[in-house]
C-alpha cells in the first residue's frame, strides 16, 4: 500500500509530503483545485505517460518519491530483478529541465520499463480515462476465473497445453526436416565409420612426426655406411697392398722393410675387421619396428583427414565422440517419431477434456457473477444496467483454455447488449469495476486501488451506495478516491484536501490532511458550495457521525 508521497517542484506544487493510512482515503477540493496533480505525480513517478511540462515554472528539476509497504509478491519481483528488498519500498523519479527522467527503486537506478512492471504489483487505477485493463480480454478472463476459483485448474490446463504444444513442435520439426535428418544421418554414419576405422589416437601425429625424423636421420646414416663399405670393398685396395708387400720382399735390404710389410699386413687385416663391423651395423637396421614409408603414409592420412573435417588432428577423437552422440540423437528422433505422434494424440485428448471441464465451470461462474454484479449495479443506482458474460468456444486453443470471454452490458432499457467498451462511459466503467471488485471482494486485490472521480454524474443515495462499496472494499485493501461527493468523503479513514491559491502572480497547490472539525467544514462546502450554511454543517456532521463515533471509541 501507499505509505507516503513526497513531491517537489511538480507543476503547481512547490513541496509537499503526505502520509497515507490503511482503509479508505479520499481526496477532495474545489473544481480546478488540482486534485489530478497528485494522481499525475504518482503516474509520473511510476513511469506512466503524463504531461510533458511537469517541472514547476522557474525551477530546474522535479522529483517525486513514493514509499510503499511490501508483500511477498513484491519482494519476489525485486529479487528476480536483482534489487535487494528492504523494510519499505522507495521509488523515485527525478527529471531535470535539460534531461530525461531517471527512475530509482531503493536508490538503485532502473529503466522506465522495469518501474512500470513494478507498478503492476503496487496498485490499480480506475477513472474517467483509466479503465483500459477492464476492456482487455485477458483481464476479463482473469476476473471470471478468479471469481470461480478456477485459477489453479487453469494452471493445470496450461501445463498440459505446453507439453502438448512442445510435442507438436517436435513432431513438426522432424516431419519438416525428415530429409535433412536422413542426409545428416548418412553423413554422420560415414564420418564415424571412417574415423573409427582409422582409430587415430590423441598425440599420434606428434609421435609419428618424431619417428619420421628419427627414421630420416637413420636413413642418412645407413647410406653413409653403405658408401663406406663400398669403398672398403674396392678390390683395388687389396691388390695395391699385396703388390706393395711383394715389391718390398724383393729388396736387398729386406730386413729394413720388415716393419713396413708388417704395417701393410695389419692394414689389410684392419680393413677386413672394419668391413665386418660395418656389415654387422648395416644388418641391425633391418630389425627397426617402423619404416619410413609406412610412417609417412600414416602421417599423410592423418593430415588429410584433419583437413577434410577442418578439425585439428589432436581433436579428431573428440570430433568422433560428438559425431557419434549427434548420430544417436538423430536416429532416436526418427525412431521416436511414431511414439511422439501417439503421445500427441493422447495429450490433445487430455487438453480438450480439461478445456471442456474448464468451459463448463466458467459457464457456471459466469452465471453467478452476472447475478452478483447486476445486484451490485442496482445498489450503485444503475438499475437499468444489464450485465452479461459471453463464454464462447474459440477456434484456436490456448494455454488459458478454449474460450473467449467477453463482458457485455446495456446501460439503458431497449439498448442492445454489447461489449462494455462500446456502450459504457468512463464513469460507468469505473462503477462496473467497483461492482466487480465488490463481487470479487478478496480476490484479485492489489495492495492499493485508486478511483479517480468514480462518482461523476451521480448524487444522493447513489453516491452513498458507492461510498458503502468503497468502504467495504477498503477492508481488504487500501482504497484512494478522488471524489466530489460528500457521501463518499464522509466514510473516509483519511481525508486529504487540495487547495489552489494565488499569491503575487503565482499559483500554488496546497495539500492538507484534515482533522475531524476540518472535515466537517469541507463536507459542508461540498454540500452547499463556497457559502457554508448551518444546514450544510449539520448534514456534514451527520455524514461524519459514524466516523466521529469510531474516533470516540478509540
UniProtKB/Swiss-Prot annotation:
Keyword tags: ATP-binding, DNA damage, DNA repair, Nucleotide-binding
Origin superkingdom: Bacteria
Pfam families reported in the protein's UniProt record: SMC_N (PF02463)
Binding site for ATP: 29-36
InterPro entries: DNA_recomb/repair_RecN, P-loop_NTPase, RecF/RecN/SMC_N
CDD domains (alphabetical): ABC_RecN
GO molecular function terms noted in the UniProt entry: ATP binding
PANTHER family from the UniProt entry: DNA REPAIR PROTEIN RECN
Family note: Belongs to the RecN family.
Name by which UniProt lists this protein: DNA repair protein RecN
